[in-house]
Regions:
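Acidic, His- and aromatic-enriched active-site or binding-groove loops in soluble protein domains
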Residues: 41, 152-161
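Short, electropositive alpha-helical surface patch
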Residues: 140-156
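Non-transmembrane alpha-helical segments in soluble domains
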Residues: 6-10, 53, 57, 123, ...
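Hydrophobic residues in well-ordered beta-strands that form the structural core
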Residues: 18, 65, 89, 156-157
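N-terminal pre-catalytic segment of deacetylase/amide-hydrolase enzymes
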Residues: 1-37, 162, 166, 174, ...
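Metal-dependent polysaccharide deacetylase catalytic core of the NodB/CE4 family, i.e.
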Residues: 1, 33-37, 45-47, 51, ...
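Short acidic/polar active-site loop segments enriched in Thr and Asp
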Residues: 15, 130, 153
């Protein structure tokens, strides 16, 4: 369960870097402790907000909730904003089908200006523009440029591995957690 995973990280002295520290790390400008982890949760699901936020508050651990802001985003930010969970963009209204052939998300088929406008709207609602999660993990070079032009310093994909020095801060991988995994499985993924 989430609480035992967070408790494990705290008891084993994991460090929780900011998005700016992640950017500096992958660009080779900052050394992070070996035991560093950024906790991210996609979609801003009410179940995560109701069940997860109290855990992060209890252990004083920061996490990022990537929010689809067109899905009641303003109310979620108002109701759930706290010192430990930061809302970042999962787009305003791009988490839907309709992309170019070979791509799932509509983001890949949008004009640059429309994409940047969507991203800027989501930043305004979230109150933060440090990090972005590509809808469906799907992107093109044009999507990356729109993310950069909207002002994000980091963006995450669904590539399943750890971030390394030399990675593009706007195309970061993530280690995927599986709902219902055992604590031992979790430990194997983070160590």
């Amino acid at each position: 369960a989430l609480e035992e995973e967070i408790e494990y990280l705290v008891e084993n002295d994991y460090y929780f870097p900011t998005w700016e520290e992640v950017r500096q790390y992958v660009e080779g400008d900052l050394l992070l402790p070996e035991k560093s982890v950024v906790l991210t949760f996609d979609d801003g699901a009410k179940s995560f907000l109701d069940l997860g936020i109290p855990v992060f508050e209890k252990y004083k651990v920061p996490a990022t909730s990537f929010l689809i802001t067109s899905n009641d985003g303003e109310n979620k930010v108002k109701e759930y904003q706290n010192d430990y969970v930061t809302f970042q963009s999962h787009s305003d209204n791009m988490h839907r089908a309709g992309g170019n052939i070979g791509h799932g998300g509509i983001f890949t088929a949008m004009s640059h200006d429309d994409a940047v406008a969507d991203l800027e709207k989501s930043i305004e609602i979230c109150g933060h523009g440090d990090a972005f999660a590509y809808p469906y993990g799907d992107y093109t070079d044009e999507c990356r440029t729109a993310v950069q032009d909207a002002g994000f310093i980091c963006a995450v994909t669904t590539e399943n591995r750890r971030a390394e020095v030399g990675d593009d801060p706007l195309l970061l991988p993530r280690v995927r957690m599986i709902l219902g995994q055992s604590l031992d499985s979790f430990i194997a993924l983070v160590e």
